[in-house]
């Protein structure tokens, strides 16, 4: 007997509020979940073996953005965001023997999971001194949490032997930040200039990278 199961789901949603003549608020989200698995069951006389194999992954993003008009020439966007990614896969095998003294079940399973969690904030400014000159500048800070991967192994041979252990690297935390500025200007009808700068840094377990 074979029982496949699958599920694919994606959701995009966005709502916005007008708080006044100069302020708007936007809330957006993306939710994705894909799940696939197969279960089998076989009977051989007094023995029954069952196999369960599956994998799933999830993406989730939530963002809140505030748009503010400081003046006719200056606008800003402040964004707060949170995201999540998960990946899981597993294999589970069990063998059951029917005996006069009762059922005896042996089991072997291997489960693996990994993931990433992000939370951060960003601010961007758009400044337009005139219709031939456009300046952008801002910055961003994001906190990352990495789950590099963990494997759980389960061995169950009744009273003879049992094992349930998890193997994997520890979680890793890092902070990423950057600031930028960009200046775009029309010098004349034939020439245009676009100059700017970007500085970024990464903090990982007490070490700084720039």
Question: What kind of region is each of these model predictions?
Answer:
Residues 1-13, 19-23:
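Outer-membrane beta-barrel translocator/receptor signature
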Residues 2, 35-38:
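Outer-membrane beta-barrel translocator/channel fold
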Residues 52-54:
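Non-catalytic, glycine-rich low-complexity segments
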